[in-house]
Amino acid sequence: MGQKVHPKGFRLGLTSEWDAQWFNEKKYSEYLLEDEAIRNFIKKNYNQAGIARVFVQRPDAERVLVSIYAARPGILIGKKGAGITELRQALEANFNRKFGIDIIELKTPETEASLVAESIAQKIEKRASYKIVMKRAITAALRRGARGIKIMVSGRLAGAEIARTEWYLKGRLPLQTLRSVIDYSTARAETKYGTIGIKVWIYKGDQNI
């Protein structure tokens, strides 16, 4: 039986990066939980911004620097930067720390696995055909520069009595090659028939390591 490894975890320090940059021996677990709470807070309140990644840095015990990678940064920035001020104040009120915020625009959101997975989940929840949604996502990713993409959905697809798994793969997907830059993410669609799981792998090319 084949053993599966997380595509991003497999490449950490080579072609993929950690989602946080800090070290603390005594408060490691506390900071780790707080990082996740910060990410959940931002994604929940600014879901329409198309947030693919929230990178957290802690230069000292009191300050937290947050870099937000978004497909629609204007929603976060707001008019004359008012949105950033509002977000910073909300974070400081909820987490009792000083926050610095940096917004980075994603040039090709169609090749971000997390955004593709979330988009598919939202469309399936709205009763769109999972086959059409998957094929359109694959076409869009390849058109925007992806070298290969695989999408897998599992569950009671189209309301079927028996759960099953279906997947589409187009292009290359060299999962065993460490220099290959592979983005991976998962999402869940909650339908009246039950939960449908979505997994997305996107191959973006090779990187010198």
Swiss-Prot record:
Keywords: Ribonucleoprotein, Ribosomal protein, RNA-binding, rRNA-binding. SUPFAM superfamilies: Prokaryotic type KH domain (KH-domain type II) (SSF54814), Ribosomal protein S3 C-terminal domain (SSF54821). One of its GO terms (molecular function) is rRNA binding. InterPro entries: KH_dom (IPR004087), KH_dom-like_a/b (IPR015946), KH_dom_type_2 (IPR004044), KH_sf_prok-type (IPR009019), Ribosomal_S3_C_sf (IPR036419), Ribosomal_uS3_bac-typ (IPR005704), Ribosomal_uS3_C (IPR001351), Ribosomal_uS3_CS (IPR018280). CDD domains: KH-II_30S_S3. GO terms for cellular component: cytosolic small ribosomal subunit. The keyword RNA-binding applies. It holds the Pfam family KH_2. The keyword rRNA-binding applies. SMART domains: KH. Residues 38-107 form the KH type-2 domain. PROSITE patterns: KH_TYPE_2, RIBOSOMAL_S3. GO terms for biological process: translation. Binds the lower part of the 30S subunit head. Binds mRNA in the 70S ribosome, positioning it for translation. Part of the 30S ribosomal subunit. Forms a tight complex with proteins S10 and S14. HAMAP family: Ribosomal_uS3_B. Belongs to the universal ribosomal protein uS3 family. This is Small ribosomal subunit protein uS3. It comes from Fervidobacterium nodosum (strain ATCC 35602 / DSM 5306 / Rt17-B1). The gene is rpsC.
